[in-house]
């Protein structure tokens, strides 16, 4: 069996894997990048379908826009990119109406005076009082219930739930309180997510070009069968070329896995995790982010801004983006691309999709029926 030697091996050529490889190459390391698919990008790329850029996972947005850590990293690595920052904090669909909030205090019109008072009180608790160590790992829904009457503040609870679902693909009981507080602080410091010009595929395309030019050994359509290790130290990987079936060994003192904790753990024990297992098995210790997106093409604009419309009165959909407000090239001429996102709450994907379509009917009514496909 053929063996190749590297300074570092990166498993997964998604956004995280490509960024990791770019950092290692900047340090003059010999890097191998392994990807089971025939293309890079993972959940941060897109396919063209009927003239629209259909994203594989992301919604053509970068966390915290041009001010965020990711944008700063791209600039430091000299990756060409353009980000169109949101022109609002967000809008909120509640009680059958879309309420636009230019800034954070604009949510007053979402909550009304009583719930807005509790919103401000929560803000004080989260940002001006030190979180006790015993509460840091507390599920956020539990922490929330200790500070407000959740039954009387339904919209306030839905506000946090929709943001957690859209941003993390997790429910409030799956998110630690310190993580919610940290993420919210970052949102206030850096701003809302921004839309990537050209879509997420354009960004990972630039990253792929960069790592290739810097000498990365990029192996596409290559399946990692096992992460090799000895005495607690990674030593390399065993891989298989999916086209030829040929197996080979790659040695390196550093192995970086960007395919998730469950799949990585399986490879350490010489097995692979299938997508079916991810959907049907539940791991309480390591909650996985499982989301479903619906892409729509509309003849008319349904969201009047470049941010996220969070949905507080739906059964499944957490939020919707209309990225063509920032880059019309993401859809055919005179069309608007909308992307909804929801947390998968069952193993029945057909039911999840049906509930998403029902939510879209509720949100947009006759406009959805007449103008969307």
Tell me the role of every PLM-derived stretch.
Residues 25-50:
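Glycine-rich FAD pyrophosphate-binding loop
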């Amino acid at each position: 069996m053929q063996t190749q030697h590297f300074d570092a091996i990166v498993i997964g050529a998604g956004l995280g894997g490509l960024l990791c490889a770019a950092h290692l190459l900047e340090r003059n390391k010999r890097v191998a990048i392994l990807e089971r698919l025939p293309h890079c990008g993972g959940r941060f790329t897109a396919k063209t379908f009927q003239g629209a850029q259909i994203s594989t996972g992301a919604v053509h947005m970068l966390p915290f826009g041009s001010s965020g850590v990711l944008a700063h990293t791209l600039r430091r690595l000299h990756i060409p990119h353009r980000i169109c920052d949101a022109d609002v904090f967000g809008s909120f669909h509640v009680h059958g109406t879309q309420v636009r909030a230019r800034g954070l205090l604009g949510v007053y019109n979402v909550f009304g005076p009583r719930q807005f008072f509790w919103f401000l009180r929560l803000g004080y608790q989260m940002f001006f009082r030190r979180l006790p160590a015993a509460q840091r790992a507390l599920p956020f829904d539990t922490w929330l219930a200790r500070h407000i009457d959740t039954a009387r503040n339904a919209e306030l609870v839905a506000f946090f739930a929709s943001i957690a679902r859209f941003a993390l693909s997790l429910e409030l009981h799956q998110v630690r309180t310190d993580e919610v507080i940290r993420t919210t602080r970052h949102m206030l410091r850096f701003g809302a997510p921004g839309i990537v010009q050209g879509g997420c595929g354009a960004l990972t395309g630039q990253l792929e070009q960069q790592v290739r030019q810097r000498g990365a050994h990029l192996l596409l359509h290559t399946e990692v069968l096992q992460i090799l290790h000895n005495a607690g130290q990674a030593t390399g990987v065993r891989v298989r070329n999916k086209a030829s079936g040929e197996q080979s060994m790659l040695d390196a003192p550093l192995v970086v896995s960007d395919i998730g904790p469950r799949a990585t753990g399986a490879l350490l024990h010489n097995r692979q995790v299938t997508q079916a297992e991810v959907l049907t098995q539940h791991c309480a210790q390591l909650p996985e982010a499982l989301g479903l997106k619906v892409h729509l093409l509309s003849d008319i604009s349904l969201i009047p801004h470049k941010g996220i419309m969070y949905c507080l009165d739906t059964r499944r959909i957490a939020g919707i983006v209309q990225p063509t407000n920032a880059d019309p090239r993401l859809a055919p001429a005179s069309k608007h691309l909308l992307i909804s996102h929801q947390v998968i709450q069952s193993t029945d994907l057909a039911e999840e999709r049906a509930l998403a379509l029902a939510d879209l009917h509720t949100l947009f009514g006759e406009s959805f029926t007449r103008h969307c496909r």
